[in-house]
């Protein structure tokens, strides 16, 4: 007795699916640009935050940032992980260090190296897809002038009436009503 056709077809389909998964895993990665790149970094790095260039490679001028690597070349999870920020201290370290300090010890606010509000505005521009021209100062001025021009054009009357009645040679409307 041989193998039934249904089972052999099922085995063939499963092996084909497995082969395709393996090929896709070794194939080229996905390219990410703009808002997709920012959203993916937020997802991968979660509460740790991330850098657009690796902090350890700032001295090396030839190193590429994440935009050059992920937008123009393929990008994978391992590469994205390298741009995640490392937290300064874990929660355990912070809680034990505060317990050691006396209660009357002054606590000064810690400065941030990464301004979240500035990043959020930049990320919002990336998501909205504003062109680079509008992000530049001159571009904003040109956009403002264009907006003012469009507003003035929109509020212009459709028909401009002449100040004098052309049929009666400049006679006023009172005289024309008396004349009838």
Curated annotation (Swiss-Prot):
Transport as UniProt keyword: no
SUPFAM superfamilies: Insulin-like (SSF56994)
Entry comment on modification after translation: Proteolytically processed by PCSK4, proIGF2 is cleaved at Arg-128 and Arg-92 to generate big-IGF2 and mature IGF2.
Annotated stretches, region: B: 25-52
Secretion signal, residue range per the UniProt entry: 1-24
Gene null: resulting phenotype: Heterozygous animals are smaller than their wild type littermates but appear normal, reach sexual maturity and are fertile. Transmission of this mutation through the male germline results in heterozygous progeny that are growth deficient. In contrast, when the disrupted gene is transmitted maternally, the heterozygous offspring are phenotypically normal. Homozygous mutants are indistinguishable in appearance from growth-deficient heterozygous siblings.
Region annotated A, chain positions: 65-85
Propeptide position ranges: 92-180
GO molecular function, one term: protein serine/threonine kinase activator activity
Site (Important for interaction with integrin): 48, 58, 61-62
D: annotated segments: 86-91
Disulphide connectivity of cysteines: 33-71, 45-84, 70-75
Keywords in alphabetical order: Carbohydrate metabolism, Cleavage on pair of basic residues, Disulfide bond, Glucose metabolism, Growth factor, Hormone, Mitogen, Osteogenesis, Secreted, Signal
Expression across tissues: Expressed in the heart, blood serum, kidney and skeletal muscle including the tibialis anterior muscle.
Cellular location(s): Secreted
Region (Disordered): 157-180
Region described as C: 53-64
Family recorded in the similarity comment: Belongs to the insulin family.
Job of this protein: The insulin-like growth factors possess growth-promoting activity. Major fetal growth hormone in mammals. Plays a key role in regulating fetoplacental development. IGF2 is influenced by placental lactogen. Also involved in tissue differentiation. In adults, involved in glucose metabolism in adipose tissue, skeletal muscle and liver. Acts as a ligand for integrin which is required for IGF2 signaling. Positively regulates myogenic transcription factor MYOD1 function by facilitating the recruitment of transcriptional coactivators, thereby controlling muscle terminal differentiation.
Subunit structure, interactors included: Interacts with MYORG; this interaction is required for IGF2 secretion. Interacts with integrins ITGAV:ITGB3 and ITGA6:ITGB4; integrin-binding is required for IGF2 signaling. Interacts with IGFBP2.
Misc remark: The IGF2 locus is imprinted. Paternal inherited gene is expressed, while the maternal inherited gene is imprinted, hence silenced. It is differentially regulated in the placenta and fetus, transcribed from 3 promoters P1, P2 and P3 in both fetus and placenta and additionally from a fourth placental-specific promoter, P0.
Protein name per its UniProtKB record: Insulin-like growth factor 2
Species of provenance: Mus musculus (Mouse)
The encoding gene: Igf2
């Amino acid at each position: 007795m041989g193998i039934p056709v249904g089972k052999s077809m099922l085995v063939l389909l499963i092996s084909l699916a497995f082969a395709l998964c393996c090929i896709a895993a070794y194939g080229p990665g996905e390219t990410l640009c703009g808002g997709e790149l920012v959203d993916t970094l937020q997802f991968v790095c979660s509460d740790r935050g991330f850098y657009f260039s690796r902090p350890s490679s700032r001295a090396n001028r030839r190193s590429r940032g994440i935009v050059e690597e992920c937008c123009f070349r393929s990008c994978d999870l391992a590469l994205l992980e390298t741009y995640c920020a490392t937290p300064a201290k874990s929660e355990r370290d912070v809680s034990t260090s505060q317990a050691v300090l006396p209660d009357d010890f002054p606590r000064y606010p810690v400065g941030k190296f990464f301004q979240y509000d500035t990043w959020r505005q930049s990320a919002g521009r990336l998501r909205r897809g504003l062109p680079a021209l509008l992000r530049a100062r001159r571009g904003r001025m040109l956009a403002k002038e264009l907006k003012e021009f469009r507003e003035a054009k929109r509020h212009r009357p459709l028909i401009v009436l002449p100040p004098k009645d052309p049929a009666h040679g400049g006679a006023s409307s009172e005289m024309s009503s008396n004349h009838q």
